[in-house]
Amino acid sequence: MFLWLAHFSNWLTGLNIFQYTTFRAVMAALTALAFSLMFGPWTIRRLTALKCGQAVRTDGPQTHLVKNGTPTMGGSLILTAITVSTLLWGNWANPYIWILLGVLLATGALGFYDDWRKVVYKDPNGVSAKFKMVWQSSVAIIASLALFYLAANSANNILIVPFFKQIALPLGVVGFLVLSYLTIVGTSNAVNLTDGLDGLATFPVVLVAAGLAIFAYASGHSQFAQYLQLPYVAGANEVVIFCTAMCGACLGFLWFNAYPAQVFMGDVGALALGAALGTVAVIVRQEFVLVIMGGLFVVEAVSVMLQVGWYKKTKKRIFLMAPIHHHYEQKGWKETQVVVRFWIITIVLVLIGLSTLKIR
């Protein structure tokens, strides 16, 4: 919205600063951060008054029993902060802004309904797996179709392979839709599985969003894209605004979500943030880079799939408990040790992902 002020720069020279992506990206991050910090205490009080307390698994680590009753659904604060900040600082004429907000809020609505059933109706299972998959699939397919249309118009219907500048595989409509669907739905569920310890998913989301913001900035400028051998995606520079808003909102939320957490994000936050990250990766054609940067999310999801699949086949477990962060807790790691060490791993993975900008 503030971008419109740049049109009045003829009357007031200083207003032309609003046309610069870097300025608006920084302001989007600060706005979302301030929003989360300002409304965080109110959100916690409101969730507590509504008795939206998290029910902790009795078969999980015994140290988690003290978390029982901690307010959940705090992800609604994150989504509101991202939406408000993006609308204030983003370009409303850019279709990617609306696709990202649509995916964020649609998957957030699913997570909200799931959380609401768990905490208000005391339904430990929440919505059925079938209902959740249908909802996620519908959102992902609609977003994928919209992105395919935009990608087809800009000749960016390709698959980029990191570290190899000569490999850019044409996907076609089926390949594009399948890859986009798997990226969006897969990342959504992977982040949700990661969100099991205080701050464990929140900071990695910040790191991955920041990394993808750099790719979006480079891809949205033809000269940078050409120099770095990236696909030029017209309008991708506005995706930076969304990514930095996500960073700011999550950092503000982390203030209250850090150990010992005063509030959990719940499915409303985790499902939405994961889907948004996946959508950003599809827009900038960096699905493989997302796998690298979000390696923590990948490992968490794979650990669950391996555990479930192996147990069904052999009645034995590979890990002491899945997702894998609980495995290390059972091995004696303190919760804060698991969280910080997984953060460090994510920092390294994001740096490796960024190195693909030059190592080709």
UniProtKB/Swiss-Prot annotation:
Membrane topology term: Multi-pass membrane protein
Organism, scientific name: Neisseria meningitidis serogroup B (strain ATCC BAA-335 / MC58)
Transmembrane segments: 24-44, 69-89, 92-112, 133-153, 158-178, 199-219, 239-259, 263-283, 288-308, 337-357
Pathway: Cell wall biogenesis; peptidoglycan biosynthesis
InterPro entries: Glycosyl_transferase_4, PNAcMuramoyl-5peptid_Trfase, PNAcMuramoyl-5peptid_Trfase_CS
A single Gene Ontology CC term: plasma membrane
Keyword terms, alphabetized: Cell cycle, Cell division, Cell inner membrane, Cell membrane, Cell shape, Cell wall biogenesis/degradation, Magnesium, Membrane, Metal-binding, Peptidoglycan synthesis, Transferase, Transmembrane, Transmembrane helix
Family designation: Belongs to the glycosyltransferase 4 family. MraY subfamily.
One annotated GO biological process: peptidoglycan biosynthetic process
HAMAP family with a match to the protein in the record: MraY
Catalyzed reactions: UDP-N-acetyl-alpha-D-muramoyl-L-alanyl-gamma-D-glutamyl-meso-2,6-diaminopimeloyl-D-alanyl-D-alanine + di-trans,octa-cis-undecaprenyl phosphate = di-trans,octa-cis-undecaprenyl diphospho-N-acetyl-alpha-D-muramoyl-L-alanyl-D-glutamyl-meso-2,6-diaminopimeloyl-D-alanyl-D-alanine + UMP
Function: Catalyzes the initial step of the lipid cycle reactions in the biosynthesis of the cell wall peptidoglycan: transfers peptidoglycan precursor phospho-MurNAc-pentapeptide from UDP-MurNAc-pentapeptide onto the lipid carrier undecaprenyl phosphate, yielding undecaprenyl-pyrophosphoryl-MurNAc-pentapeptide, known as lipid I.
Gene Ontology molecular functions: metal ion binding; phospho-N-acetylmuramoyl-pentapeptide-transferase activity; UDP-N-acetylmuramoyl-L-alanyl-D-glutamyl-meso-2,6-diaminopimelyl-D-alanyl-D-alanine:undecaprenyl-phosphate transferase activity
Keyword check for Acyltransferase: no
Cellular localization per UniProt: Cell inner membrane
Primary site of residence: membrane
Top-level division of the source organism's lineage: Bacteria
Cofactor field: Mg(2+)
Documented EC number(s): 2.7.8.13
Protein name: Phospho-N-acetylmuramoyl-pentapeptide-transferase
A family per Pfam: Glycos_transf_4
